[in-house]
Amino acid sequence: MFCYQCQETAAGTGCKLAGVCGKKPEVANAQDLLIYLLKGIGLLATLNNSCSAGCTERPKVHHFVNDALFSTITNANFDVESIYARIDTALALRDRMLAKTHERGIDVPDLDVLSWQGTRAVYAEKATQIGILSEPDEDIRSLKELITYGLKGMAAYLEHAARLNHINPDINEYILQTLAELLLCRDAAKLTALALETGTWGVKAMALLDSANTVSYTHLRAHETGA
């Protein structure tokens, strides 16, 4: 495992044997594999972007991707079976999207993330091949992870807002497009710009959740208690 997404990470450089938070290696590795597959789903969604407004499955893609990203944030989910279940779903969703993409005559790049097939028996092995450190360039790796953590935070806001029936498809589409960029882009300048753009969209996600809470529960104000 290798995880450095929180400020408590071992020695300030990264957890390699187990998470300071209590996350075990098999969970960290499973989360890496899930994120890897989400990038493939993001790419397929982007290739089919002309379908974004009318495809009946698009909202399901948005919901799954947000839920999956949310499940990998710090201290959110240490259940490897739960992450494996999401990997199962990601593979099935990817294959359906891939079939639709081929049906539409859209060219699909020859990438492992779009073709790899595996069962739970090999998830752990595959995860060690595509983790954070599989990117050899430290600068590119750092930028991509910074953006990834931004997407995870956005997904958390969006999931909470969706529970209150507040959904912004534009933000969901941004997440899909950015996942695709994380898969394909290795230009530091472009990734730096993308990190800044992700921050802008993160503020929009925060505003959506704030609106959802305000509409549902009214503005926060002090109350007297009987204590």
Regions found by a protein language model. Name each.
Residues M1-S216:
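Often metal-dependent polyanion-binding catalytic scaffolds in large enzymes
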Residues T218-T225:
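Conserved small/polar residues in nucleotide/adenosyl-binding loops
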